UniProtKB/Swiss-Prot annotation:
Protein name: Phosphoenolpyruvate carboxykinase, cytosolic [GTP]
Organism the protein comes from: Homo sapiens
Tissue specificity field: Major sites of expression are liver, kidney and adipocytes.
Reactions performed catalytically: oxaloacetate + GTP = phosphoenolpyruvate + GDP + CO2; L-seryl-[protein] + GTP = O-phospho-L-seryl-[protein] + GDP + H(+)
GO cellular component: cytoplasm; cytosol; endoplasmic reticulum; extracellular exosome; mitochondrion
């Protein structure tokens, strides 16, 4: 465990910005203990100012970590070591005394719902990595708020890091700087420690001037101590500790203790032509279009969608029983490939300035490029790939890494919701689950009850490309789109969701499931998607008001034949889009039951077992 050292240390590190005396006592102790351990040359207490940000960006440009993209205003490109490009589930752990606090004990094999590490193993791993790991580098102290500063739903963290890329990215993704330090006072904060794991002088040359230590990468969460400790990776999901580490893994555990929800969900506001507005939250696995839905331009005349957040929602019932949600983030950390003027015009407008791109391709005129950008190149313009080599479409490999990213301020989104920073949050009236299902699952259905809706979330599955190319596409279980992000035992998480129905005066949101990705026999999508998805949101909007007509099926309520507004669309095969096959659903419920019984085992709530049985029975009577 991180050592609890005595106060008043004789730090050899020189404080180059800020003053230790100005820090709250607990923050100062956290900093001094870890500075003594990691031995940086300098300490820089971040103030979050424009001036500081400009200096750090300039310094990274000089060191070759960032390149300036001259086509845009204050936009930058980082190319990472090719071994450090994504979250690494196998090296992401939660440390608790008891394994069962972190994951249910599966019937056989390993848990797919998280990775547990014992306290003893973590202590060994920590002591093998952190002593002296920041030698020759600067330790940056990043005070940050998840959620609007001062909101009752917000939480504060302090991240210590030796990566200026992390500082610049955290300034976009969180509210960061002096105002946060002033707000901490004697209050609680989550302690975040990050190192790229490359003390100076270097033992090996860097690739792309990108410091990382892939052999020793470890991302650990210590929920009982409110600590997140990350070593060896500079990539966003592993190093921007406010993101998945805090906002989902740590926060879901805090939420369980404090009676709220921390979820992998977008939040959007939708307004009908009469000016009535509702807020919806939606959970989809990666690459199923969360950001596209959150920033949609509706094709339906008179309808308007506005974005509160594209990735994470913190939700809590207020005294009146409304489920209130905030977006704890301050920016978007979006997947670049596939983003275009056609698929997401609002994202394209958002990223024209003040944006850090990572592992996308660069054009010779100082622009960015990726697969699916759908923009013609000016004549004579060449492309340099994310591997820093000249690239042409004949190369047989992508110019941008499939997980390449843009990190951009949410405030720049042209359709950001007026209430996106509202301290009390926005009232959620509908929750949407969804996945990429080429067969069997209809475009939309509504859960029969809160309990049934929780089961629908637990049963979420989505098509993923297997790592081994020859395996083709497989359908993966991804309950609540949270499978890589649960901060505690998934069985207890389900019980926590079910308990929301007991909340006094709770106005429970309706729960829906969508599938934009169903295909016909020729492998063509049956539904056009993107802006046309507003037609499905319209039906949900009217369902929440008790207006739209439905048909009861074994899996839930679907729209009656004429209930979806298809005006202006070409031919849509509604029969195929909404068909529910007995054979398919018998197999589906069997797979779901096996997964939940194997993986959640003794911790599966009896309400979920009852929902499985009831669904089986309804299907058998088809």
């Amino acid at each position: 465990m991180p050592p609890q050292l005595q106060n008043g240390l004789n730090l050899s590190a020189k404080v180059v910005q800020g003053s230790l005396d100005s820090l709250p006592q607990a923050v100062r102790e956290f900093l001094e203990n870890n500075a003594e351990l990691c031995q940086p040359d300098h300490i820089h207490i971040c103030d979050g100012s424009e001036e500081e940000n400009g200096r750090l960006l300039g310094q990274m440009e000089e060191e070759g970590i960032l390149r300036r993209l001259k086509k845009y205003d204050n936009c930058w490109l980082a190319l990472t070591d090719p071994r450090d490009v994504a979250r690494i589930e196998s090296k992401t752990v939660i440390v608790t005394q008891e394994q069962r606090d972190t994951v249910p004990i599966p019937k056989t094999g390993l848990s797919q719902l998280g990775r547990w590490m014992s306290e003893e193993d973590f202590e060994k791993a920590f002591n093998a990595r952190f002593p002296g790991c920041m030698k020759g580098r600067t330790m940056y102290v990043i005070p940050f708020s998840m959620g609007p500063l001062g909101s009752p739903l917000s939480k504060i963290g302090i991240e210590l890091t030796d990566s200026p890329y992390v500082v610049a990215s955290m300034r976009i993704m969180t509210r960061m700087g002096t105002p946060v330090l002033e707000a901490v006072g004697d209050g609680e904060f989550v302690k975040c420690l990050h190192s790229v794991g490359c003390p100076l002088p270097l033992q090996k040359p860097l690739v792309n001037n990108w410091p990382c230590n892939p052999e020793l990468t470890l991302i650990a969460h210590l929920p009982d101590r409110r600590e997140i400790i990350s070593f060896g990776s500079g990539y966003g999901g592993n190093s921007l500790l406010g993101k998945k580490c805090f906002a989902l893994r740590m926060a879901s555990r805090l939420a369980k203790e404090e009676g709220w929800l921390a979820e992998h969900m977008l939040i959007l506001g939708i307004t009908n032509p009469e000016g009535e507005k509702k807020y919806l939250a939606a959970a989809f696995p990666s690459a199923c279009g969360k950001t596209n839905l959150a920033m949609m331009n509706p094709s339906l005349p008179g309808w308007k969608v506005e974005c509160v957040g594209d990735d994470i929602a913190w939700m809590k019932f207020d005294a009146q029983g409304h489920l209130r949600a905030i977006n704890p983030e301050n920016g978007f950390f979006g997947v670049a490939p596939g983003t275009s003027v056609k698929t997401n015009p609002n994202a394209i407008k958002t990223i024209q300035k003040n944006t850090i791109f990572t592992n996308v391709a660069e054009t010779s005129d100082g622009g960015v490029y990726w697969e699916g950008i759908d923009e013609p190149l000016a004549s004579g313009v060449t492309i340099t790939s994310w591997k820093n080599k000249e690239w042409s479409s004949e190369d047989g490999e992508p110019c941008a890494h499939p997980n390449s990213r843009f990190c951009t301020p949410a405030s720049q989104c042209p359709i950001i919701d007026a209430a996106w920073e509202s301290p009390e949050g926005v009232p959620i009236e509908g929750i949407i689950f969804g996945g990429r299902r080429p067969a069997g699952v209809p475009l939309v259905y509504e859960a029969l009850s809160w309990q049934h809706g929780v089961f629908v979330g637990a049963a979420m599955r989505s098509e993923a490309t297997a790592a081994a190319e020859h395996k083709g596409k497989i359908i993966m279980h991804d309950p609540f789109a949270m499978r890589p992000f649960f901060g505690y035992n998934f069985g207890k998480y389900l019980a926590h969701w079910l308990s929301m129905a007991q909340h006094p005066a709770a106005k429970l949101p309706k729960i829906f499931h969508v599938n934009w990705f169903r295909k016909d026999k020729e492998g063509k999508f049956l539904w056009p998607g993107f802006g046309e998805n507003s037609r499905v949101l319209e039906w949900m909007f009217n369902r929440i008001d008790g207006k739209a007509s439905t048909k009861l099926t074994p899996i839930g309520y679907i729209p009656k034949e004429d209930a979806l507004n298809l005006k202006g669309l070409g031919h849509i095969n509604m029969m195929e889009l909404f068909s529910i096959s007995k054979e398919f659903w018998e197999k589906e419920v069997e797979d779901i039951e096996k997964y939940l019984e194997d993986q959640v085992n003794a911790d599966l709530p009896c309400e979920i077992e009852r929902e499985i049985l009831a669904l089986k029975q309804r299907i058998s009577q088809m």
